[in-house]
Swiss-Prot record:
Subcellular location field: Secreted
Identification of the protein by name: Basic phospholipase A2 2
Enzyme class: hydrolase
InterPro entries: PLipase_A2_dom, PLipase_A2_dom_sf
Catalysed transformations (reactions): a 1,2-diacyl-sn-glycero-3-phosphocholine + H2O = a 1-acyl-sn-glycero-3-phosphocholine + a fatty acid + H(+)
Tissue expression as described in the entry: Expressed by the venom gland.
Organism: Agkistrodon bilineatus (Cantil)
EC numbers for this chain: 3.1.1.4
Notes on activation and inhibition: Inhibited by ethylenediamine tetraacetic acid, ethyleneglycol (beta-aminoethyl) N,N,N',N'-tetraacetic acid, p-bromophenacyl bromide or N-bromosuccinimide, but not by iodoacetic acid or diisopropyl fluorophosphate.
Amino acid sequence: SLLELGKMILQETGKIAITSYGSYGCNCGWGHRGRPKDA
């Protein structure tokens, strides 16, 4: 589940998944605006 994934990310990286990676990816940022990262 997403909850378990978030717990795993926190345990392995020490980062909170939604705040650290929420704007990462092809649809970056709120409202799917912004430039893609690592593209």
